[in-house]
Amino acid sequence: MKIENEIISSVIAAVKELYGQDVPEKMVALQKTKSNFEGNLTLVVFPFLKMSKKTPERTALEIGDYLKENCADVIADFNVVKGFLNLSIAPAAWVGLLNTINADPKFGEKPVTENSPLVMIEYSSPNTNKPLHLGHVRNNLLGWSLAQIMEANGNKVIKTNIVNDRGIHICKSMLAWLKWGNGETPETSGKKGDHLIGDYYVAFDKHYREEIAELKAQYEKEGMDEEAATEKAKAEAPLIKEAHEMLVKWENNDPEVRALWQKMNNWVYAGFDETYKMMGVGFDKIYYESNTYLEGKKKVEEGLEKGLFFRKDDNSVWADLTNEGLDQKLLLRSDGTSVYMTQDIGTADLRFKDFPIDKMIYVVGNEQNYHFQVLSILLDRLGFKWGKDLVHFSYGMVELPNGKMKSREGTVVDADDLMAEMIKDARQTSDELGKFKDMSEEERQEISRIVGLGALKYFILKVDARKNMLFNPEESIDFNGNTGPFIQYTYARIRSIMRKAAAEGIEIPAELGADAPINEKEIDLACKALIAPIELATGHSAYFLGKPNPLMMRTGLRILGVHSEDAVMIGDRMDTDIVAGIETGLSTILVLSGVTERAAIKRFPYRPSLVLNGVGDLPGKAK
């Protein structure tokens, strides 16, 4: 029995009979009823109001009466709350659904065909000057999982990665290796290549800071104030000058610099491959920034010739986005060098040439929300058919409890170290609980790997991607509660029961009888299993509009007739108020009279324009 099909077809029939109108299937929006209301599924009736010419409540009541009378085998009862029609599903219908799910190993999936849309998903995006870290773990797991979900929903999927393999940060590691490496390699050091290069990036930073301190002290003795002395020292330090000289040589294709760059990057790529393999993720196509940044300049120059962009007196090239409620965006500096936006345009151009993309999804942290708003507009202007509708799959930060698994720098946790620690914790916990009884050492190692990495993946993926999260290794490895190990253990127990039943000749029925008892938890599980196919069939899913959604903010600005340059966001929460303002291009003021404390600001990758103790300090400050 297909509950969703019967409800959708019955709603279409109801609108036809009650209001004499034909409606497409996609207009029937069903979602799971909120827990504080009675019912299992909720029908949104607002799309039908133009047809009924009645209030939302009256429209919902009329459709509800029709469904209860004409779809009684599925609808047991209904109630109406402010225009939302909450439907209670008949127990026999749930039993039928469970039988359908049990009989179909691919229930809810849609097969991929030649005509399926092609979706490209970008995730990971590492730099080749250091290993993958905790933030990459969340990014990789979200990107890989999203790819599996999109493919199960009938899309052709290309998983792609853009490697940031050029720039001053890469030259810093190269210069440090030349100065202090003594020819060290991954083989001679016994280190993974990405960790080895990361060590030299740290070494550069250490010596660079020492040079800055010496120069700063010298400039202050000469009468310069502290801030000016610091800035001059950063620019005049011999190491940073050498690094910039190396970057110029790289851009001019100096053979020695290019050979060193290729050798050290290859070490890093080998290290990345090991990390990706352990994590269980991969890619269909990898792009490299060193191959894409020049393409971006070409596309910008083409746009300039077509009048899509403009050049300022200093020779820099800009895009005017003020008619979009945004600002002007730099695309090429006055010296002709590109910025990140330009590089993303170049990467998009190469991808579009390589694949007939229908939809592009970028899995990138929420600090880049504004960047992708702009990129979407620019790609649309340049003629990319998917540009306007590109998806930025935005996610929040992930952190560890203080004092746990800090790296050498004390700030970033390496992905390799985290996974090794998870496997170690899984081994220890399983030993303590007696899970390894009568197992060989090889079996114990494999189960520890499966349980440890399963704990990591589930703990990260169970949290709403849009939210910041705290990853606690000890909680994730618990064999009780909402954890990966508990789910794995429960599955193993169920399989064990089924094996014992088969050994004792107990036959498990293929189907439940129509009168089989079913409890509320089972109904809730069945309801959740039903939601994905409903959303797939209708093209609609529950959507909640609120902070930090930039659409709400831009709509408000348009209604007020105010440009983003003339408005300011004032709030007491970094994760909603301030990020909402930043994503919309507003100046932001954080007041400390509410939720966020001053000490907590440094945890976020973005900063407010101004921090005040309270709203009483506002007069004269917000300009």
Regions found by a protein language model. Give the residues of each.
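NTP-dependent nucleotidyl-transfer catalytic core
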Residues: 16-42, 55-529
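Generic hydrophobic alpha-helical segments
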Residues: 11, 63, 348, 553-556, ...
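Short, flexible active-site loop motifs that bind/organize anionic cofactors or intermediates
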Residues: 49, 361, 365, 393, ...
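Asp-based, Mg2+/Mn2+-dependent phosphohydrolase catalytic module
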Residues: 503, 521, 528-623
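Generic start-of-chain signal for non-secretory N-termini
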Residues: 1-20
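Phosphate-backbone binding interfaces of nucleic-acid-interacting proteins
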Residues: 52
